[in-house]
């Protein structure tokens, strides 16, 4: 966390002493522990089971599984052959050897973090990143690198009544 977020609880109170709703980009055990240490009532935070559900469904592998079900053999949609879920360095190197440049993605990351772009093989730095990611998260997503025309992210808010599209970033 940045220095300005040292005391989260100070930022969670409105002038009239009402508590603000906590809506992080992503929940995890570290954030939950931090909020509890800042005095947030644990009963207002996700349970351990909910955190595990969030972690499982936040992994890129889950998104890839959903994507493959939505694909429906439509030639306008990028098919599953443009990427692999690699469990070791050899699989990563073989994919890059076959496809040239690639994008390496850690299974649990967002907002541009956990992404590396490689061309013509892995550098020693890339290999170290892959080993650490494989060790901590179990896999590395390896995708063919396409020419980027425009980058954006779609933002959604999930709640008990469904999912709302918020906008683009």
Task: Label the model's feature ranges.
Residues 46, 119, 169:
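Residues at the C-termini of beta-strands that transition into short coil/loop
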Residues 20-22, 102-104, 140:
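Generic beta-sheet signal
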Residues 81-83, 101-129, 151-153:
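Glycine-rich phosphate-binding loop of ATP-grasp-fold ATP-dependent ligases
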Residues 100, 125-169:
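Phosphate-binding site of ATP-dependent enzymes
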Residues 2-98, 110:
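Conserved N-proximal alpha/beta basic substrate-recognition cap immediately N-terminal to
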Residues 68-71, 91, 102-104, 126-132:
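Intrinsically disordered, low-complexity boundary segments flanking structured domains
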Residues 27-29, 107-109, 121, 145-147, ...:
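An acidic- and aromatic-residue-enriched active-site/binding cleft used to recognize and process polar
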Residues 92-99, 118, 133-134:
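Alpha-helix C-terminal capping segments
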């Amino acid at each position: 966390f940045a220095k300005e977020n040292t005391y989260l609880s100070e930022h969670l109170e409105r002038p009239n002493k009402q508590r603000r709703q906590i809506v992080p980009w992503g929940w995890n055990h570290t954030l939950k522990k931090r909020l509890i240490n800042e005095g947030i009532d644990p009963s207002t935070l996700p349970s351990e089971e909910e955190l595990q559900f969030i972690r499982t469904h936040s992994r890129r592998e889950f998104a890839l599984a959903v994507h493959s079900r939505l694909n429906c053999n439509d030639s306008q949609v990028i098919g599953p052959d443009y990427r692999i879920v690699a469990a070791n360095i050899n699989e990563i190197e073989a994919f890059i050897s076959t496809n040239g440049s690639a994008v390496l993605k850690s299974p649990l990351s967002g907002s541009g973090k956990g992404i590396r772009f490689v061309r013509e093989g892995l550098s020693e730095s890339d290999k170290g990143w892959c080993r650490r990611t494989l060790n901590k998260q179990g896999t590395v997503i390896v995708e063919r690198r396409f020419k980027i025309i425009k980058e954006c992210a779609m933002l959604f808010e999930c709640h008990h009544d469904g999912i709302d599209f918020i906008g683009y970033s």
